[in-house]
Amino acid sequence: CTGKFKGRKDAAVHLENGAKKVIISAPGKDVDNTIVMGVNESSYDPATQDVLSNASCTTNCLAPVVKVINDNYTIISGMMTTVHSFTNDQKNLDSRHKDYRRARGCTQSIIPTTTGAAKAIGLVIPELQGKLSGMALRVPTPNVSLVDLVVNLKETVTAEEINAKFKAASEGELKRYLAYTEKPLVSIDFNGTSVSGTVDALSTMVMDGT
């Protein structure tokens, strides 16, 4: 597993040196497949796929949630915002970076920046290609991030119905990857969690039935 080499050309050097498979722990370029566990792992073909991407942490959080909605309803479009803890790509003090906003001190500001997580959904749920977009807000917390997903659905729904679908999935096919809570928790309560994401049922809202 590598997070250093994010493209097939560089990651494949591991194959030349004896590795049988290479997993990129980030979005990958020109890889054989992008896999999010619980969503599309059945698309993995060990006979033909040697360099794989496990996508980003945000995509792994977002994709199971989107899968539940997409399996039960028709998504017309969607927008996500990830409120993301700072990472080692950022600077502790104002410094140099190709992204001027990420050049600012990560513990001192809320930093708007880009994320490819929403677009990556199309790689693991192909029918949603081009239907989701998003942005990131890097915030001064060291761990645990949040994804705020807003979708426009074809069907008329209620928050209770949506939550029931999430709860059922978290207790069934997505039990290893998606959790569900109705408790008034905050980010620090999720330190050490083993799942890809937790649905905060208290924050589920529906406007005009869609």
State the predicted function of each range.
Residues 1-103, 205-209:
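N-terminal Rossmann-like NAD(P) cofactor-binding subdomain of oxidoreductases
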Residues 74-77, 82-209:
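C-terminal substrate-binding/catalytic lobe of Rossmann-fold NAD(P)-dependent oxidoreductases
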